[in-house]
Amino acid sequence: MTQTLSQLENSGAFIERHIGPDAAQQQEMLNAVGAQSLNALTGQIVPKDIQLATPPQVGAPATEYAALAELKAIASRNKRFTSYIGMGYTAVQLPPVILRNMLENPGWYTAYTPYQPEVSQGRLEALLNFQQVTLDLTGLDMASASLLDEATAAAEAMAMAKRVSKLKNANRFFVASDVHPQTLDVVRTRAETFGFEVIVDDAQKVLDHQDVFGVLLQQVGTTGEIHDYTALISELKSRKIVVSVAADIMALVLLTAPGKQGADIVFGSAQRFGVPMGYGGPHAAFFAAKDEYKRSMPGRIIGVSKDAAGNTALRMAMQTREQHIRREKANSNICTSQVLLANIASLYAVYHGPVGLKRIANRIHRLTDILAAGLQQKGLKLRHAHYFDTLCVEVVDKAGVLARAEAAEINLRSDILNAVGITLDETTTRENVMQLFSVLLGDNHGLDIDTLDKDVAHDSRSIQAAMLRDDEILTHPVFNRYHSETEMMRYMHSLERKDLALNQAMIPLGSCTMKLNAAAEMIPITWPEFAELHPFCPPEQAEGYQQMIAQLADWLVKLTGYDAVCMQPNSGAQGEYAGLLAIRHYHESRNEGHRDICLIPASAHGTNPASAHMAGMQVVVVACDKNGNIDLTDLRAKAEQAGDNLSCIMVTYPSTHGVYEETIREVCEVVHQFGGQVYLDGANMNAQVGITSPGFIGADVSHLNLHKTFCIPHGGGGPGMGPIGVKAHLAPFVPGHSVVQIEGMLTRQGAVSAAPFGSASILPISWMYIRMMGAEGLKKASQVAILNANYIASRLQDAFPVLYTGRDGRVAHECILDIRPLKEETGISELDIAKRLIDYGFHAPTMSFPVAGTLMVEPTESESKVELDRFIDAMLAIRAEIDQVKAGVWPLEDNPLVNAPHIQSELVAEWAHPYSREVAVFPAGVADKYWPTVKRLDDVYGDRNLFCSCVPISEYQ
């Protein structure tokens, strides 16, 4: 035996699990691209002056089992008290059928945002159901497919109110004083950059204030009071003031829809429809508005359209509102939202149906009535007579009550003067209520649940008669069928089968980094120690979270070359916004608040200019040269022209053209010379980790897409995480939080997300990835990602020219295939190729970004040579098909490309095409067939005939 014990223990075993090509395959690919080793290849490609001499020291790799045991020990430091804190977060009962078949199912969580609707019909249907739930509960006409959280939805409502307001000279936004404090925090942050004045006052005093363009009310106030705002809304509408209402999704099951009371915009958190609290997220927000405002709405909207055969099909509608098209003129910078969480909430509603939801809501309310009756019998006073699930109880000995609660491992809301808040939820039992009686009244209270139940059942006045819902909800068949677990399991599987996710094939989307989301990384997110914590619980109950977050932040600091990391932003777009705010506040601290010009290369991702606009900056575009690199001459000219008004540059590295620009350090130096800061977009961090770093390059701040580089799955369009890394001088200006302050982890700045650490419950995924890969594995992952991209580029460049390359004709971790010459020559477009790839079993690469008429391919390090070769063979076969069109064998108007994708029903229909059925659906090399369920979508029909709610069930049959 020649191996040592250390070798046999194989602590780096996960590295080989994560990286697709084995050593032999890597060598074959290196030979194909003309490089001797991974180090030699990256040494050729990455500019010498930015190569790290040694990898960042983030530790040795650990096995899956060792890492899980280590993280379990950390998680066990969290204390699982029963939390009645409320404030927009409650405990839930996630149905096991949804837990197992969606949250723990890679067929759902590894899919991408449904830009390619033909391979996304399942989750699009689930999202359409989510929109229908939103429409029914809010009483409005148009709903989005989720926003990031309730507080950011409030900020979006404010921005939308200004867009649609007819009071163009008004610049004040009124917020009722009993909205959740974290909502107000995020609204204030957003208002500052937009130049809005925020007024906070009692809702009934809103008419005392002048020049108000919009109002934010909360139907059930933060301390529990149900408000009937019907008359107030009517008066506000008569004055042309846009009214937004924050609502509780479970309360809406019983309460009057705000839309029926005249509200223009209604939003809230869908968390309590089955999504664990998770120390703050991720959670989906719902958002609805009147039909007349639909083109001003933020976020994704799913619409019903037709496919090429005239069959009903779903798609993302009205995308011209969004950042990837409208850039700085977009309604919002939102890119990824919260699709996976919206779909959990959607299926929660499907599984329970209207009867089940009413039973849950009524049970919560009944237990709240029982608690209220018992407390009042014993002489305690409630601050509000009307409530749904939350009581504000006035107490004399508040310290004693809180001490007894702590001894009983109970969290009450403690920030209310001379009172405590108690919010019940669907997990609350009669035993819990008895325990609350003991905490508030002492053990000898003498109260009986059944006696109290009889009293309140016949005389409950806690919901005003005018506020009781009098219309039916969720009448569509989809909410009234799938109530047995067998039916639900089959329905979810039928949706999953319609979609193409990473569990079936490579998803070669450029700028998206669709890498492995390993099972070991996913396991901890459903551990109760992580899933069940309230984000506003006392910090000493979340020591496990704090340790995990601090350790992850330390690793990210080392990997990025920055000095500090803030975990709050809950998407990449939010990270951009937070980073730009840090720059803005830094300049203001130096009495240079006039610096408001943001330079952005022409090739930038659409979120960059949209985020800059949100941060109150002016966007100035910097040209790219013929090689796709930043034009240094133009950069210097624009920087000099901006002068003392230069705030920053937003640059992506490697560039969005898939190249390591040789002059990146010079770019940083030019901007610094004129007093600006360098924002390095972390979208392409997968080509930096272990090789170089933003801080080493010379940047001041970056966001990190943990859902790209660090293995959080895309979830079909969310969740994401976008923490920001900053140099020391920017660290005091990262987001803070008004409710929670943890020394060394949060600043006193305004918040950008509802929870202090954003979507904290998915951070264990990135922790596990880094822990299992170690410094050695992380560097190798970057190197193999570069190898895979260069292998594809070298194999395809004769058939599809690679548009941009760096030194020696190399690319970074992705490559752009130029389809424009072929289109000009043959009429076949990048869209045709993208749709034909579906017939070969692949999701399309990124289309027409960053250059129109191109396909951008990013294979990631997780794809094996076998899968890469399968993709290459498919692309070469498609090129041969294009040649058939060029040669006149198939006419341009009738060939396998323009008719793609092909569906099963076509095989049994009359066949009049000049190519065979076999060529259509079993092209060369296709063995394990993926079947799309719809043909190519008719986008024009969808936008001209906008329909964004559930269609009759017969349409799906």
UniProtKB/Swiss-Prot annotation:
Catalytic activity entry: N(6)-[(R)-lipoyl]-L-lysyl-[glycine-cleavage complex H protein] + glycine + H(+) = N(6)-[(R)-S(8)-aminomethyldihydrolipoyl]-L-lysyl-[glycine-cleavage complex H protein] + CO2
Cofactor: pyridoxal 5'-phosphate
Family: Belongs to the GcvP family.
Subunit structure, as described in the record: The glycine cleavage system is composed of four proteins: P, T, L and H.
Name of the protein in its database record: Glycine dehydrogenase (decarboxylating)
UniProt cross-references to NCBIfam families, sorted A to Z: gcvP, PRK04366.1
Listed GO biological process terms: glycine decarboxylation via glycine cleavage system
Top-rank taxon: Bacteria
Source organism per UniProt: Escherichia coli O45:K1 (strain S88 / ExPEC)
